């Protein structure tokens, strides 16, 4: 009988311990994998930490696209494309952080201009900085309004259909010093991108551009050589001078020489007229003599 009671007590203790462990296991969060630990969240569809904005690059953009895929629970993702050299980007970043508080169910990603390729910016329709985009599995919506809190909240609500938190909280945080009422943008920074970044980020595009430029130079080089030779010949002729052009120039520059030439021409004409008159008189006298002799 005592053995049965002992066995029964052991069974009760074992069952109690198992139930306690099961309860503890239910209350403890599951262990994160190494990938989840590195990425900073367990579920791709949940970035619910208030004010959490992920700094990303091309890989994070691909992850954001995967998060809003139809197979996942996340409906929308917010993207901020900014540039560190752009003052308007520094003004809009605090407002973007605040929007991640208001819409904590929407993952927010901040993408710096130098961390992505130019083709990626073109893909997302980024033509200036800063640019705020809301995207889902079927569309990208670019925000083009002012940067006041009311305007941003209206944009988020219209696109996502998600209502904000307490209106009184929004009212208290409406006048944030970093907000700017006008939608200024820094132009697309092609000139600001260093050749090193272009070569590293757009290797194929850079090599293709260099090839096209070299090919164009090869095609126009014969024409350029002919043009240079022709120009050099003209310059040499202008320096040495043509004898005929030199004579004409001297003739125009020296009036004495021109007057002497004019006098010589007049004397030649007078001499020629006198010679013709003498010849005509001689012929007339000889003809009159022959007529008288015949009579």
UniProtKB/Swiss-Prot annotation:
Transmembrane segments: 208-228
Matching InterPro entries: APRL4/6 (IPR044606), Thioredoxin-like_sf (IPR036249), Thioredoxin_domain (IPR013766)
Keywords of this entry: Glycoprotein, Membrane, Signal, Transmembrane, Transmembrane helix
Entry annotated with the keyword Nucleotide-binding: no
Domain of life: Eukaryota
Gene name, Swiss-Prot/TrEMBL: APRL6
Signal sequence region: 1-22
GO cellular component terms listed in the entry, alphabetical order: membrane
Name this polypeptide is given: 5'-adenylylsulfate reductase-like 6
UniProt KW Glycoprotein keyword: yes
Xref: PANTHER family: 5'-ADENYLYLSULFATE REDUCTASE-LIKE 4-RELATED
Glycosylation sites: 136
Gene source species: Arabidopsis thaliana
Bilayer topology term: Single-pass membrane protein
Segments forming domain Thioredoxin: 23-161
Localization, UniProt: Membrane
Pfam families: Thioredoxin
Chief place where the protein resides: membrane
């Amino acid at each position: 009988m005592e053995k049965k009671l002992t066995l029964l007590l052991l069974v009760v203790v074992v069952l109690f311990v198992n139930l306690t462990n099961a309860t503890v296991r239910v209350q403890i969060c599951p262990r994160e994998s190494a990938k989840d630990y590195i990425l900073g969240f367990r579920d791709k569809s949940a970035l619910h930490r208030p004010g959490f904005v992920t700094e990303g690059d091309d890989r994070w953009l691909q992850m954001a696209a995967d998060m809003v895929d139809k197979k996942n629970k996340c409906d929308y993702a917010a993207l901020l494309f900014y540039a560190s050299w752009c003052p308007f980007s520094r003004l809009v970043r605090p407002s973007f952080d605040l929007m991640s508080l208001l819409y904590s169910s929407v993952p927010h990603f901040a993408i710096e201009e130098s961390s992505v390729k130019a083709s990626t910016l073109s893909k997302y329709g980024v033509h200036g900085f800063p640019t705020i985009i809301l995207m889902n599995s079927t569309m990208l919506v670019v925000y083009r309004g002012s940067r006041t809190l009311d305007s941003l909240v209206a944009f988020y609500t219209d696109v996502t259909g998600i209502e904000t938190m307490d209106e009184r909280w929004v009212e208290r945080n409406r006048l944030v010093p970093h907000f700017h009422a006008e939608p200024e943008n820094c132009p697309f920074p092609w000139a600001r991108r260093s050749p090193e970044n272009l070569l590293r980020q757009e290797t194929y595009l850079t090599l293709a551009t260099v090839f096209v430029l070299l090919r164009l130079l090869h095609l126009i080089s014969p024409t350029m050589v002919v043009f240079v030779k022709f120009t050099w010949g003209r310059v040499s002729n202008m320096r040495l001078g043509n004898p005929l052009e030199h004579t004409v120039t001297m003739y125009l520059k020296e009036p004495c020489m021109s007057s002497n030439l004019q006098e010589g021409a007049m004397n030649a004409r007078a001499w020629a007229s006198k010679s013709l008159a003498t010849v005509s008189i001689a012929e007339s006298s000889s003809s009159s003599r022959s007529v008288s002799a015949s009579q």
